[in-house]
Amino acid sequence: MDNLNLNKHISGQFNAELESIRTQVMTMGGMVEQQLSDAITAMHNQDSELAKRVIEGDKNVNMMEVAIDEACVRIIAKRQPTASDLRLVMAIIKTIAELERIGDVADKICRTALEKFSQQHQPLLVSLESLGRHTVQMLHDVLDAFARMDLDEAVRIYREDKKVDQEYEGIVRQLMTYMMEDSRTIPSVLTALFCARSIERIGDRCQNICEYIFYFVKGQDFRHVGGDELDKLLAGKDPKE
């Protein structure tokens, strides 16, 4: 379900400006998705060259965030958008902030992997790689949903985070077992726990982007809402009922 309609303005230039910003967001999203995928690969394969490329590439992500942010400020000042147009611009501003933070996670994963892990830690990395791929797919899907402002898909992705949380909890239990069985693994396990938590937070970031889609489509703030209450709000019902 595509909820975008950018061909309604009297000013064709306004349409072009909105479309340009949306295109930049999707470019940034694709860049961050690739950064994250490469970071997971670099960590799992202990590929130092790939890790260094990811670290270097984070600068480009940061530059894109600044450029899109400035474009949004200009369009607000120049066009004074209202209603759905304003919601779209605000959703974009918030979404690029989430994408920038996901890019930071990719950077941190690579820096940590370069400093702390070696081939002897491979068993610790297998589960992290699986969790990482799960969040990469989640990011891919939420970017697709954002491009179309697809409410139904955003709801599905929002709920997918529960599976990411469950996978993360399983990894924590596994890593705690490693530490109890061999105290010599404590430093590397603590590093793996840090990476696991960072990856799990990507799922939360994707949930936040889903909330911005809800906000654009429904015109209502869905932050800090979950479970049955979320279902009622999306259906247009009073959550107190």
Swiss-Prot record:
InterPro entries: P_transport_PhoU, PhoU-like_sf, PhoU_dom. It is found in: Cytoplasm. GO terms for molecular function: protein homodimerization activity. The keyword Cytoplasm applies. Keywords: Cytoplasm, Phosphate transport, Transport. One of its GO terms (biological process) is negative regulation of gene expression. Gene3D superfamilies: Phosphate transport system protein phou homolog 2, domain 2 (1.20.58.220). It comes from the Bacteria. Its main location: cytoplasm. The keyword Cytoplasm applies. GO terms for cellular component: cytoplasm. Homodimer. Part of the phosphate (Pho) regulon, which plays a key role in phosphate homeostasis. Encoded together with proteins of the phosphate-specific transport (Pst) system in the polycistronic pstSCAB-phoU operon. PhoU is essential for the repression of the Pho regulon at high phosphate conditions. In this role, it may bind, possibly as a chaperone, to PhoR, PhoB or a PhoR-PhoB complex to promote dephosphorylation of phospho-PhoB, or inhibit formation of the PhoR-PhoB transitory complex. Belongs to the PhoU family. This is Phosphate-specific transport system accessory protein PhoU. It comes from Enterobacter cloacae. The gene is phoU.
